[in-house]
From Swiss-Prot:
Pfam assignment, any one: CAV_VP3
Protein's UniProt keywords contain Cytoplasm: no
BP GO terms, sorted: symbiont-mediated activation of host apoptosis; symbiont-mediated perturbation of host exit from mitosis
Protein species of origin: Chicken anemia virus (isolate Germany Cuxhaven-1)
UniProt protein name: Apoptin
Length: 121
């Protein structure tokens, strides 16, 4: 009836056509893409495609690469220790000196001091 027989192989989902030439077509609209996955290099020739830049953080050619497909890629780990930062001093006398220097630099006129009168009871 409508049941599949066990000896019938499923139909192919993709069709493989071997390349007619290993040389890429030499037209200005043809691009070659190489993808390296676990020691296997896949080369795709895309003809009739437009140029589009897609910058990534980790991208490199897979030539002579055996394990990862990346070659001469900078290390992007963030768990490296940071260089020591310059510590600020907490000495109050240094703060007062810098405060006095700032007051000498300012050009705004200060208001004249007035004598305080104290009332004694």
């Amino acid at each position: 009836m409508n049941a599949l027989q066990e000896d019938t192989p499923p139909g192919p989902s993709t069709v493989f056509r071997p390349p007619t030439s290993s040389r890429p077509l030499e037209t200005p609209h043809c691009r070659e893409i190489r993808i390296g996955i676990a020691g296997i290099t896949i080369t795709l020739s895309l003809c009739g495609c437009a140029n589009a830049r897609a910058p990534t953080l980790r991208s490199a050619t897979a030539d002579n690469s055996e394990s990862t497909g990346f070659k001469n890629v900078p290390d992007l780990r963030t768990d490296q220790p940071k260089p020591p930062s310059k510590k600020r001093s907490c000495d109050p006398s240094e703060y007062r000196v810098s405060e006095l220097k700032e007051s000498l630099i300012t050009t705004t006129p200060s208001r004249p001091r007035t004598a305080k009168r104290r009332i004694r009871l």
